[in-house]
């Protein structure tokens, strides 16, 4: 090989080495730059993550600090409230102790004052006793000196003189005590009666002796009468009730004084009208069925009454007799309603006096039981009631209450007296019992006639169902003093000339009016 070829080979080798070196250097620098960039990126990511973790940790720390602060504040408030409560309790106890201390001081002062007063009274009594003893000794000596009496004789004379001097004072004191007792008893009785009346509400009832059966048409009247009057005669014979068929449109009137028979006839006739088959055999069947329905209704009314009043344990026959009072009236007042009212009033008054309320209601409910069958059995309703109560083994207090509520016997218990009082209250209250319209109007007219017969009376008015009369007088003719005299005179004439239940209030009104008109 020639030296030129060798030189070229060497130069090429050197060139290759130089080129390789620079290529490698470039590659190495590129790798180093990439690594540096990667490291910087990793470092940046690490810083960002660290910053995020730092912020998150700060937030969590702040939340925890806030929570701890709230809990601490809550605990502080609770402790402060507890301390405040304890402080209030201590203050209250301190105030209570102060009040007790003041009360004890007052009591101590009061006791000292009473003790001082008692000592003064004791001293005064001792002084009076010594004076009395001295006076007695002086009188004894004087009597012995004057009359030469012995000590025992003088003592007897002194005792008689003292007794005579004090007997009048003792009688006055006893009379005053008796009057006070009567006044207190009257007040207590009025209070009990007023409370009982306020707490008891009752219906006002009216008496009736007729019932009306409505008909679908007037043709039914001919069917009720029947051929030659057979149907109406059969119905009247079976029920004992008069049928009045007149010009009243679509109605038949049943007239009779026995409400049970009248109700039986009404139910029977109503069933016959609804059924349409009206002949003697059908009438007998319906009347018998109606009697059974009325009997069932009477028993139900008795049971309902005992339940409403609160009286239990009555004999079944006595309950049925009690239910018959539903169809019994006295002066227009339904006797069953009256008996219930008396039972309630008696129970209310008994509760005020501390008596047996149940027994009182029982006595009040049964006090008029005799009226249920007094038209069937001989004797007064009181006698019949006593027999029924004895027959069905009622309590002796109940029997005595029945026997004494009209004064036939003496009451032996407070309950018997209460029954009589409740009976009078129920019968005497306004509207409880009725009178005939003619007598009522005549009594009102007589009241006004008596009032207007006096000179100076301008007009009179009978009001409140005749229980009060108001007289308007002329102020120029009658002065205030004459108005009182006029009221007394009219009251006396009413008492002498009229028969009336209860009381009539006489009111004289004298009125003077002065009228002027401003123009």
Curated annotation (Swiss-Prot):
Annotated KH domain residues: 209-272
Ranges where the HD domain occurs: 335-428
Listed transmembrane segments: 3-23
Listed GO biological process terms: mRNA catabolic process
InterPro entries with a match to the protein in the record: HD/PDEase_dom, HD_domain, HDIG_dom, KH_dom, KH_dom_type_1, KH_dom_type_1_sf, Ribonuclease_Y, RNase_Y_N
Topology relative to the membrane: Single-pass membrane protein
Main subcellular location of this protein, as a coarse class: membrane
Name of a matching Pfam family: KH_1
GO cellular component: plasma membrane
Keywords: Cell membrane, Endonuclease, Hydrolase, Membrane, Nuclease, RNA-binding, Transmembrane, Transmembrane helix
The enzyme's E.C. designation: 3.1.-.-
An example molecular function term from Gene Ontology annotations: RNA binding
UniProt xrefs under Gene3D superfamilies: Hypothetical protein af1432, K Homology domain, type 1
Localization (cell): Cell membrane
Entry keyword Cell membrane: yes
Extent of the signal sequence: none
Function: Endoribonuclease that initiates mRNA decay.
Similarity section: Belongs to the RNase Y family.
NCBIfam families listed in its UniProt record: HDIG (TIGR00277), RNase_Y (TIGR03319)
PANTHER family: RIBONUCLEASE Y
Protein name as it appears in the record: Ribonuclease Y
Species this chain originates from: Bacillus licheniformis (strain ATCC 14580 / DSM 13 / JCM 2505 / CCUG 7422 / NBRC 12200 / NCIMB 9375 / NCTC 10341 / NRRL NRS-1264 / Gibson 46)
Encoding gene per record: rny
